[in-house]
């Protein structure tokens, strides 16, 4: 089975449209990622097959959360090399996408990808999550927030929940053992105006992890997120 067939099968299983044009964008994205990775550390995953399975398909499987298909605006917080945001955009080109990262060199890379594979309505922002969440143009202004960033769920929730509209969702891509994090984060999520709605298992020969789905129930207090550095050093309890 070639790469197109692998990705097409995954998309069909999720009820998603996949075609040659979308596939070509993924392949060009892969090539740009490998080229830039020689100059800066974007990913430790460099084999073509692994990039497709561990980055692209892993990102596409966020669509196991079905309401994502109806989202009109998505922000990817701590996007790194563009995962899962850019694969989501390729699959769902009509969505408005914001890619947020704290390293400017990554933003330069992302802007190059967006230009090269001709993605429309994508904004790449250089900034810290806790700072940008206080700006009126981003705060409580997105249907869905996604993040594959490596951070404790309590910390990640304070970074991400302020970006969501009331009634919207935060999808945290977490590893296979997430029970303790969920237990520890419930009060913080409640303080921030959210509620854990679902935990979706993502499992096959390559994957074993969870999508933690948090729904925004009420507005986030202006107290949150707290200033840069405090969120990680003193997590909400």
UniProtKB/Swiss-Prot annotation:
Enzyme nomenclature, EC number: 2.1.1.-
Keyword vocabulary terms for this entry: Cytoplasm, Methyltransferase, rRNA processing, S-adenosyl-L-methionine, Transferase
Cellular location(s): Cytoplasm
Residues annotated for S-adenosyl-L-methionine binding in this entry: 78, 83, 129-130, 148
Cellular compartments per GO CC: cytosol
GO molecular function term, any single one: rRNA (guanine-N7-)-methyltransferase activity
Predominant subcellular localization, coarse grouping: cytoplasm
UniProt superkingdom: Bacteria
Pfam families: GidB (PF02527)
Function: Specifically methylates the N7 position of a guanine in 16S rRNA.
Assigned protein family: Belongs to the methyltransferase superfamily. RNA methyltransferase RsmG family.
PANTHER family given in the database record: S-ADENOSYL-L-METHIONINE-DEPENDENT METHYLTRANSFERASES SUPERFAMILY PROTEIN (PTHR31760:SF0)
Protein name, per record: Ribosomal RNA small subunit methyltransferase G
Organism encoding this protein: Clostridium kluyveri (strain ATCC 8527 / DSM 555 / NBRC 12016 / NCIMB 10680 / K1)
